[in-house]
Structure formats: structure tokens, C-alpha cells
UniProtKB/Swiss-Prot annotation:
It is found in: Secreted, Cell wall. Residues 115-132, 922-937 have a biased composition (Low complexity). Gene3D superfamilies: 2.60.40.1280, 2.60.40.1290, Immunoglobulins. Homodimerizes; via N2-Domain. Interacts with host NRXN1; this interaction mediates bacterial attachment to host cells. This is Serine-aspartate repeat-containing protein C. A motif (LPXTG sorting signal) lies at residues 920-924. One of its GO terms (cellular component) is extracellular region. The modification Pentaglycyl murein peptidoglycan amidated threonine is found at T923. Residues 51-495 are annotated as: Ligand binding A region. Cell surface-associated calcium-binding protein which plays an important role in adhesion and pathogenesis. Mediates interactions with components of the extracellular matrix such as host NRXN1 to promote bacterial adhesion. Residues 56-71, 84-114, 133-164 have a biased composition (Polar residues). Residues 685-695, 712-896 have a biased composition (Acidic residues). It is a peptidoglycan-anchor.
Length: 957
């Protein structure tokens, strides 16, 4: 892509992680295009179409002076010399037809003189041989996978008119691989519905069988369907093997070159026919590297192998092996040899290379005795070549040597050519032989073979006339030839030339071949004639060289395909045609010399990068400030001009992103907005410091672009990082009627996705009406592990209204010698509305080592060791205004060293009598047992004081 537009037409983009993104060069047409392929087997434009008209007449006068009659034989041959007359299919006709017409007509008339006792005879045989080669394609999924840079019109496919370059396929692995040494892939080319049919045919009424009359308008047709495996590659081969009695071609021998074409004239495989083994070996071109799912059908003109199938009315096994698939069929052959004719001739074959006519004439098959025998050949449009010494005269010693196929085994004949004087005249267009050779009479039989070469100076289509002038009559036979399609331009052994040269990498892009620049391997090169018809194709070798051989003088076109990853260099730079680049398509002229100046240069297509930065715009000004940092993990997508995604990445830890290996062209960069962030203002300052928005259109033209940025900021609605993993282990049994109406109207629109692991065992009945509309989506993992061991000094105004109706009927039979008249029958209806404000100013010298291990589960396990040696004058005004200031320091090892103001000895280890005291209730719950415990404790303390006081009093007494 050489888009010259600037980079200014882009809108919005985000930097991404600095990942290198490799992008494959986009070949035109990712979607596969179905293309029909037709293979045309064998003919390759070098088959002759022969129509042989033989006309023999015998007119003998009643006396010796009567002018001899003239026998005429007309033999027409439609000869396409070195041109292929393939008719390519049109868009509305998916069948491709190649006409290869060979029509042979033989008419021979032998009329004896009325002086003879026998009645006149008229023997007439007319034969028309028309051969047609047709190929048709089954339009299955044939997918173009070429790396060609331009589409081609396809006229043979009704619904598909262009061949698009491939995307994906085989060439993507090695786009410039030179052809490797191929292997035989007979097992990968599959043939079905094979048939050898007689076109027209003649029904033998006596036998009821259809016969192949080789000289009477019949032709053999080899037909088959085929498929080619996709694994087949350029250079691979497969074979057609013909049997002993069967060969390709018609009257004209098959060309050594047997190319296979598709409907558009593109060469699928190059075939070489070996007449020795009667085998054609096909080598696949790079076409099979460009297309997949190739399948089709074909018809191929074939003929009886006359040197082996020699006898009329005989069934011969016609056998063929196409790849690994074999087929055979017995066919009755008839050549129509007339053994009673003194003179009969036939075109044995037409040479496919020089179009020479190889003729065979049978002289005196009836073995008549003559005193005069002059054999004359007159050529029109042809010439003899006396130096070739190919005018042969063989004496027949065995009647069986006159084989019906007109192809005798000359090794078994007696060559007597040197015994005769062959006189050439009329510019080598007439040859005369006196077969009597000095004898007075003779009944000898001869087989005469000649070769007539086309004469380009003649405007006539040409003919060959034979006469046998005897003492009895004059016999004549004429063979004329015409072209069905009116073309006949070959000229014997015309010299052939070469065309080609070099494809190289132009590293400095100057359009000229420099000494340090190397060739490019594996570039496809196609040769076409002046009419645009493909003649050949090849692939450059490891040195970038290519060559087409065997070309005649003329004008040719050479097309180079652009290898993947390359761009054509400047064409026709400088004045030296031998070292410049001729472009993708060039014309080469051959005129009596090789043309090795057709070169093409390419340079590696440069690749570019784009990207930059995504940042956190903390001040929301749309500009990148030095203190603002990048945002990690933002997804960035790259699309091509068609909107196809060609890459995705994410910004790195610095907010950077990057796409690499891009061609010049138009792209779109799309930033995915991070959750919880808002797009900042766009295009607020210079291009490399602003934000470009969520989608940015950008054009790369021969340079990188690292100005594609985007910024985001976070809304300030309640930065409530409410992930308080508050492990508040507050074992605070605080019965705090704490109506903590914490109307914390934290309207933090902060989308609080608070992962609050609040393991707060805090029994705090906090009625916290936290109407926090906190939308704070702050994924703030504030693992505040606040191990709030809450020494909750809960000043719990525990109004312990203990209304302890301690009807203690304490019958304390205390052996207290207390003269206290205290009958202590203390029906102590202690309706002790003890507000337990226990400001117990108890001056009781009660050393109350109250190891009150108040584990704040307020189990009141008051191990009150009241050893109170208290001299307690104890006016124990136990006005226990126990306001229960309840320093509920829940694990409070409250050693409650209740200083009773009495310097007493620490003795009275009063044991806790509530060994099974129950735990304090949950905060806010009601439990009278706790109040009762306090009441009883107070009563016991008072009772103890009374007893102690009584004992002291007694001692004092």
C-alpha cells in the first residue's frame, strides 16, 4: 500500500501494552473464490486435422491411341501447425471445446476398358474422419490461492468472473519457494467414468457390432472425470500410459509437448509424450500451488496404433492407464484397404513438428503384368527434399506385406530404391520413376513411401497427385489438404530461440541491478503470445533466473507475479535495458536471436508501527502532565480499512501499547474504557500530548505513528474505600443501649463494591442507620484487618435496677458470741432496692483481695477472699450505691483490690460461692440472675461483717 494521505484524519485512540503485533500481508480476497478449471489434454495446438479424399478413375480407350484416363484422389487435412486452436469458454457456457478435426475421404473408381471381356466395375468408398477434443469442467470448489497482486477475468465460469489472490493457503508458508524436484503423484490424481468411445461408428449388420472405420469419419474418444488432491505441488508428475493398439492424436501424430490447459488457457501441467513407451508424463506447474479443489472432465482424441493394429475387421484391445486407474475395451478396426486396386495411396501420418506428409502408395496389389509402369508424383503446396533421401521404393515379396493399415514393417521389405532413377523436376515438386527399369515386362509389386514438406510460398492449401501410367491404362490418385480453421504457418525446421532473464531484490530501490543485489527465488513468470494466450509458465530458480525455450521469431508478453512481502521497484530506470526493471508486465521480441533482457525488480515492502499511551488524567484537563501516570491493562483493538479486526493488545504497566508490521494504509484504533473511569476531553493540545478519544481513524503513509493517546479520570463521588476488613473482635459485652444513630449519610456515589470482611464479633447493637448510598465501586482492597480488640471502656450507664427482693431468711446460726442481742433472726426482708451505686466507702479494713477475675463475661465469679480481719467497727453503711460503672473491659482481669480504707491483714480469703455462675447476658438482654448475685454478695458481706464485729466484741469483753 502506497497511500500518500497524511496521518491527520484519525479520531481517538489509547496506548497499549508494548506488545509487538505481527500482521500478515493481506492478500486480496480472504474469502475463497470458486473457479472452474478445464483441463485440455494432449493436443496443445499441435494436432493435425486430416480429411483424406481419394478419387481414382480408370478410363481406357477402345484403341491403342486413346488418351489414358486420369484417376484423381483428393485428400484433405486440416492442419494446425504450431498453433493451439483451443476455444475458450464464454461466461454463459461452462464447457470448453477444442476442435481437432481430421476428415479422410477416399473415393476410388476402377473402370476397365470395354475391350475387356469383364464388365466395368465401380468401387467406391467414402470415409470422413472428424476428430474433436473437448474438455469440460465440473465446477466444484476450486479455490484461488494465488499470490498474484492483480485479479484476472475468468470468462469460463458462469457465476465467477474474477480470480482473486489467495489468503491463505499453501503459499503463505513459503511464498517464494522455487519448484522442488517433484514426485510421481499418480495416487493423488483420481480418474473416474473412464471410457473409450467410437465417435459415430459403423454397425456391421452381419455381426451386429459397431466397428471403428479409421478412414471413414470415425474417431476414438478417450473420456474421463478427474480430481486432483490439494497436496499436489508444482513439479509433481503423473502419467497417461496407452496400450499396444491405442495412442493419442489422430492422422497427425501426437505432439511431444502435451500441455494441459484450463478453460482460460492457463497451463495446469506440461506433458511430454514418449512415442517409444507410448506414455505421456505430465508435470504440474505452479497452477496447483495457486488453486485448490481442482476437478473436471475431459475428452481426448485418440487413434488406433496403426503399426500394431494392422488388419481390417479385427478386434483389438484398446487399453489406457490414467494415473493409477486402468481401463480397456475391445474395438474392431477397419482401414478399408482395397486389394484389387493397382494404385492406392494413403497418408500414413502427418509429422506433428514440421507438418510433413508421410505417404504410402501400394503399386500393383493385384500382381498384374505390365510392359510399362511409370510412377509420377506431383506436389502442389509441398516440395520434396532430395537430400533427405526419404523417397523409398520397396519390392514386395510377400502379398501379406500390403498391410491394411498402410503402415508396413519396412524392415521386412526389400529396399530397391537404389535400383531406380528418381528424377526431380519443377523445383522439386515433381518426382518420376520408371518402375520397369529396363525390363520388357514385369508383374512386380511395390510399396513406395515419400515425404512431402509444406511450401510456404504457395497460397494453395496443397495436394499430392499420383499417377501410374501402364501399357493398359493410366491410374491416378489425388490427396488434397485443407485447414479447417484456415491457419497453416509452420515452416519446416525453423530455428528456435530463448527468452527470459532475471528477477532480483532491488535493495536500494533505484530500479537498477547492482552487483551486490541478489535474485529472488520462487517468482511466478507467465509467457503469452501476441494475442494474450498463455504459452508457458515457470518459476524463478534460487538465483532469480528464468527462461522460456523453443520459441520462434515473434512478439511475446511476459508477466511477473509480485512475491508476498515485496513491492515492484521503479520500471525502466536509466537507459540500459539489460539492467533495469521492466515492470510486472513487459513485451519481448525475438528476431533471429535470443532475448534475455526481460527483468523485474522488487524491494521488500516496508512495515510500520503505530501506538503510544493511555494515562490517568487526574486533573481532567485532557493533557498529559509529567506527574500523571499510565493505566495498565486497557484493551486496544486495531481494525483495517474494511473494519476487520487485525490485532488486539493491552497497555503495559506504563500505559504503553504498540502495533507492528503494518503496511501503509488506513486503520482504526479502538480503546475500551476501563470500568469506573470517564473519558477525558479530546484534542485539547498538541497531538502527541492530548487524548484522541475512544476511536481513532489513522492513515499510515511511509512512517510510524506514535501519537495515538487517550486519557481517563475517576469521578470524585465518595472515595469510600469501603473495603473495611474490620476484624472487630470486640468481645465487648457492653449492654450499651447505645442508640448509635450514626446517620452516616455517606452519599458516596462511589459504587462501593466493598469486600468488607468485617468479622466484627462486636455485639454492638449499634442501630447504625448508615444510609450510605455509596455507589463506590472502589475495588479498593483495603484489607484493613482492624483487629479492634476493643477495650471498650463502655461507660455503660447500666442502671442496674436490681430490685433484688432478696428474702434471705438467713437463719445464720452463727456461733457468734456476739452480745449483740442480735438474734440475727434477721428475717431480712432485704427488699434491697439497691441501686448498687456501690460507692462503698466501706471503711471495713476489708482487705478484699477480691481476685474478681471478672472475665467481663460478667460471670461475677467474685472470688471475694474477704478474709477480712477487719477490725471493722464497721458501721457498714453498705449503701451500695453500685452505679455499676461497669468498666466492661471484657477480658479485664480485674484484680479488684477493693481498698476498703481498712489496714487489715490479707487473710479473709472468701471463696466464690458461685462456682457455677452463669455468664452475663448479651448486651441489651435482660437477666435478673446477675442482679441477684450482686444482692447475695452484698448480703453475705454484711453478714460476715456482723459476725466479725460480734466476735471482736466478745473478745473485748
Amino acid at each position: 500500500m502506497n497511500n500518500k494521505k497524511t496521518v491527520t484524519n484519525r479520531k481517538g485512540m489509547i496506548p497499549n501494552r508494548l506488545n509487538k503485533f505481527s500482521i500478515r500481508k493481506y492478500s486480496v480476497g480472504t474469502a475463497s473464490i470458486l473457479v472452474g478449471t478445464t483441463l485440455i489434454f494432449g493436443l496443445s495446438g499441435h494436432e493435425a486435422k486430416a480429411a483424406e479424399h481419394t478419387n481414382g478413375e480408370l478410363n481406357q480407350s477402345k484403341n491403342e491411341t486413346t488418351a489414358p484416363s486420369e484417376n484423381k484422389t483428393t485428400e484433405k487435412v486440416d492442419s494446425r501447425q504450431l498453433k493451439d486452436n483451443t476455444q475458450t469458454a464464454t461466461a454463459d457456457q461452462p464447457k470448453v471445446t477444442m476442435s481437432d478435426s481430421a476428415t479422410v475421404k477416399e473415393t476410388s473408381s476402377n473402370m476397365q476398358s470395354p475391350q475387356n471381356a469383364t464388365a466395368s466395375q465401380s468401387t467406391t468408398q467414402t470415409s470422413n474422419v472428424t476428430t474433436n477434443d473437448k474438455s469440460s469442467t465440473t465446477y466444484s470448489n476450486e479455490t484461488d490461492k494465488s499470490n498474484l497482486t492483480q485479479a484476472k477475468d475468468v470468462s469460463a465460469t458462469p457465476k465467477t468472473t474474477t480470480i482473486k489472490p489467495r489468503t491463505l493457503n499453501r503459499m503463505a508458508v513459503n511464498t517464494v519457494a522455487a519448484p522442488q524436484q517433484g514426485t510421481n503423484v499418480n495416487d493423488k490424481v483420481h480418474f473416474s467414468n473412464i471410457d473409450i468411445a467410437i465417435d459415430k461408428g459403423h454397425l456391421n449388420k452381419d455381426t451386429g457390432k459397431t466397428e471403428f472405420w479409421a478412414t471413414s469419419s470415425d474417431v476414438l474418444k478417450l473420456k474421463a472425470n478427474y480430481t486432483i488432491d490439494d497436496s499436489v505441488k508444482e513439479g509433481d508428475t503423473f502419467t497417461f500410459k496407452y496400450g499396444q493398439y491405442f495412442r493419442p492424436g489422430s492422422v497427425r501424430l501426437p505432439s511431444q509437448t502435451q500441455n494441459l490447459y484450463n478453460a482460460q488457457g492457463n497451463i495446469i501441467a506440461k506433458g511430454i509424450y514418449d512415442s517409444t513407451t507410448n506414455t505421456t508424463t505430465y508435470t504440474f506447474t505452479n497452477y496447483v500451488d495457486q488453486y485448490t479443489n481442482v476437478s473436471g472432465s475431459f475428452e481426448q482424441v485418440a487413434f488406433a496404433k496403426r503399426e500394431n493394429a494392422t488388419t481390417d475387421k479385427t478386434a483389438y484391445k484398446m487399453e489406457v492407464s490414467l494415473g493409477n486407474d486402468t481401463y480397456s475395451e475391445e474395438i474392431i478396426v477397419d482401414y478399408g484397404n482395397k486389394k484389387a486396386q493397382p494404385l492406392i495411396s494413403s497418408t500414413n501420418y502427418i509429422n506433428n513438428e514440421d507438418l510433413s506428409r508421410n505417404m504410402t502408395a501400394y503399386v500393383n496389389q493385384p500382381k498384374n503384368t505390365y510392359t510399362k509402369q511409370t510412377f509420377v508424383t506431383n506436389l502442389t503446396g509441398y516440395k520434396f527434399n532430395p537430400n533427405a533421401k526419404n523417397f523409398k521404393i520397396y519390392e514386395v515379396t510377400d502379398q501379406n506385406q500390403f498391410v491394411d493399415s498402410f503402415t508396413p514393417d519396412t524392415s521386412k521389405l526389400k529396399d530397391v530404391t537404389n535400383q531406380f532413377n528418381i528424377t526431380y523436376s519443377n523445383d522439386n515438386k515433381t518426382a518420376t520413376v520408371d518402375l520397369m527399369n529396363g525390363q520388357t515386362s514385369s508383374n512386380k509389386q511395390y510399396i513406395i513411401q515419400q515425404v512431402a514438406y509444406p511450401d510456404n510460398t504457395s497460397t494453395d492449401n496443397g495436394k499430392i497427385d499420383y499417377t501410374l501410367d501402364t501399357d493398359k491404362t493410366k491410374y491416378s490418385w489425388s490427396n488434397s489438404y485443407s485447414n479447417v480453421n484456415g491457419s497453416s504457418t509452420a515452416n519446416g525446421d525453423q530455428k528456435k530461440y530463448n527468452l527470459g532473464d532475471y528477477v532480483w531484490e532491488d535493495t536500494n530501490k533505484d530500479g537498477k541491478q547492482d552487483a551486490n543485489e541478489k535474485g529472488i527465488k520462487g517468482v511466478y513468470v507467465i509467457l503469452k503470445d501476441s494475442n494474450g494466450k498463455e504459452l508457458d509458465r515457470t518459476t524463478t530458480d534460487e538465483n532469480g533466473k528464468y527462461q522460456f525455450t523453443g520459441l520462434s521469431n515473434g512478439t511475446y508478453s511476459v508477466e511477473f507475479s509480485t512475491p508476498a512481502g515485496y513491492t515492484p521497484t521503479t520500471a525502466n530506470a536509466g537507459t540500459d535495458d539489460a539492467v533495469d526493471s521492466d515492470g510486472l508486465t513487459t513485451t519481448g521480441v525475438i528476431k533471429d536471436a535470443d532475448n534475455m533482457t526481460l527483468d523485474s525488480g522488487f524491494y521488500k515492502t516496508p512495515k510500520y508501527s503505530l501506538g503510544d499511551y493511555v494515562w490517568y488524567d487526574s486533573n481532567k484537563d485532557g493533557k498529559q502532565d509529567s506527574t500523571e501516570k499510565g493505566i495498565k491493562g486497557v484493551k486496544v483493538t486495531l481494525q483495517n480499512e474494511k473494519g476487520e479486526v487485525i490485532g488486539t493488545t493491552e497497555t503495559d504497566e506504563n500505559g504503553k501499547y504498540r502495533f507492528d508490521n503494518l503496511d501503509s494504509g488506513k486503520y482504526k484504533v479502538i480503546f475500551e474504557k476501563p470500568a469506573g473511569l470517564t473519558q477525558t476531553g479530546t484534542n485539547t493540545t498538541e497531538d502527541d500530548k492530548d487524548a484522541d478519544g475512544g476511536e481513532v481513524d489513522v492513515t499510515i503513509t511511509d512512517h510510524d505513528d506514535f501519537t495515538l493517546d487517550n486519557g481517563y479520570y475517576e469521578e470524585e463521588t465518595s472515595d469510600s474505600d469501603s473495603d473495611s476488613d474490620s476484624d472487630s473482635d470486640s468481645d465487648s459485652d457492653s449492654d450499651s443501649d447505645s442508640d448509635s444513630d450514626s446517620d452516616s449519610d455517606s452519599d458516596s456515589d462511589s459504587d462501593s463494591d466493598s469486600d468488607s470482611d468485617s468479622d466484627s464479633d462486636s455485639d454492638s447493637d449499634s442501630d447504625s442507620d448508615s444510609d450510605s448510598d455509596s455507589d463506590s465501586d472502589s475495588d479498593s482492597d483495603s484489607d484493613s484487618d482492624s483487629d479492634s480488640d476493643s477495650d471498650s471502656d463502655s461507660d455503660s450507664d447500666s442502671d442496674s435496677d436490681s430490685d433484688s427482693d432478696s428474702d434471705s431468711d438467713s437463719d445464720s446460726d452463727s456461733d457468734s458470741d456476739s452480745d449483740s442481742d442480735s438474734d440475727s433472726d434477721s428475717d431480712s426482708d432485704s427488699d434491697s432496692d439497691t441501686d448498687s451505686d456501690s460507692d462503698s466507702d466501706s471503711d471495713s479494713d476489708s482487705d478484699s483481695d477480691s481476685d474478681s477475675d471478672s472475665d467481663s463475661d460478667s460471670d461475677s465469679d467474685s472470688d471475694s477472699d474477704s478474709d477480712s480481719d477487719s477490725d471493722s467497727d464497721s458501721d457498714s453503711d453498705s449503701d451500695s450505691d453500685s452505679d455499676s460503672e461497669s468498666d466492661a473491659d471484657s477480658d479485664t482481669d480485674s484484680d479488684s483490690d477493693a481498698g476498703k480504707h481498712t489496714p487489715a491483714k490479707p487473710m479473709s480469703t472468701v471463696k466464690d460461692q458461685h462456682k457455677t455462675a452463669k455468664a452475663l447476658p448479651e448486651t441489651g438482654s435482660e437477666n435478673n440472675n446477675s442482679n441477684n448475685g450482686t444482692l447475695f454478695g452484698g448480703l453475705f458481706a454484711a453478714l460476715g461483717s456482723l459476725l466479725l464485729f460480734g466476735r471482736r466484741k466478745k473478745q473485748n469483753k
